[in-house]
From Swiss-Prot:
GO CC term, one of those recorded: cytoplasm
GO BP annotation list: glycerophospholipid metabolic process; phospholipid biosynthetic process
Gene3D superfamilies: 3.40.50.1970, Dehydroquinate synthase-like - alpha domain
The gene coding this protein: egsA
Pfam family, one: Fe-ADH_2
Organism of provenance: Methanococcus aeolicus (strain ATCC BAA-1280 / DSM 17508 / OCM 812 / Nankai-3)
Sequence positions that bind Zn(2+): D151, H232, H253
EC class: oxidoreductase
Top-level taxon of origin: Archaea
Protein name listed in UniProt: Glycerol-1-phosphate dehydrogenase [NAD(P)+]
Cofactor note: Binds 1 zinc ion per subunit.
Amino acid sequence: MITTPRYIVIEENGINLLNDILLKLNLKNPLVITGKRTKKYISNFDYFYYFDYIDIKRNEPNKEFIENICNFDCIIGVGGGKAIDVGKYIAYKYNKQFISIPTTASNDGIASPIISQQGKSITAESPIAIIADLNIIKKSPKRLLSAGMGDIVSNITAVLDWKLSYKETKEPYSESSAIFSKTIAMELVEFVLSNDKNNLEEYPKKLVKALIGSGITISIAGSTRPASGSEHLFSHSLDIITKKLNLNINGIHGEQCGIGTIISAYLHLIEGNITIGEYENIKLSLEKVGAPTIGEQLGYDKNILIDALANAHKIRNRWTILRNGISKEKAEKILKKTDII
C-alpha cells in the first residue's frame, strides 16, 4: 500500500503546529528521537528523549529501549539525516506512526520510506506528517543546503538510468513516477538559474518542497529508482573507499551525488539521451548554490575519484549508464572531460 504524508508543513515557525498535528492524528504519547545539537528545537515540548540507545546497524535495539517502546504511539525524528533515519527505522520495526521534523534540507530522506547504507536500501516507515520549520532550516549550514541541490538534480540522471534499464533489461518502469521525479528536479534547476546568485531567498523553501516531493516519489514507485541511479552508486563507492582507507574526509551525500550527476549526465549526453543544454544546466545550478563540481572541493584526490567511478557498478545489482562497468582509463577520461579532475 502506498503511504504518503497526511500533513506537510513548510513555513516559518512551523514546529509550533506540532501539537495541533498530533491532536488531528490522535497521537498522544510520542517518542522523540533527536541529537544533542537539535534537541533545543523540541525542548519546549514535554516529550521523552531517546537517542543514544539506538543503533540501526545492530539487529536489535538494547533491552531498555524494547521495554519502553510499547509506551509510545508514534516516533518523531528531529534533526538531520541520522535522527530521521533512526526514527523512521524504529517506527517501521515497531509498527508506529512517524513524524519527520528536519532541521536541514540536505537529502530526500526527510520524506522517503528508505534508509540507504553503503548502497543498500533498508525499508523504513513513511512519515505521516512532515514539519519543515523554515526558521530552523535557514539557520542550518549553507553547505548542507547546497548539498540538497545535489540530491535533487540526481533525480534527472536516476530517471534516465531507470528508463535505460527498462529498454535494455525490461526492468519494470513507471512513466508517471519518472515524470514526477524529473519535473521536481527540473523546476528547482530552473528556479536557481532564473534568479541572481544573491537573490535566492526562496531557495530553502523551494529545496524543501523538492526534497519532500522526491521522497514521496520513492513511496509511490515502491523503489528508489526515481531518485537513485548511477550517480548514487558513485557516491556510495566513494563512501566505501573512504571507510576502507580510513580517510579523514567528511563527505556529504548530496555533494557527492551532485558530482556523480555531472558524470552520469555526461555519459547520457554522449549517448544522446539529454541535450548539451540540460547537461550544462545541471552543472551551473550546482555552482550557483555553492555545491561542489570538482573533486578537490570534496577533498578527494584524482586516484580515489577514478577508483570510485571504475567500481561504482559493483555497489548493487542495478542497471545504469555504467552498465557492466568502465575501465580506470575510461574513468579518468570521463572525469577530465567533465572537469572534475
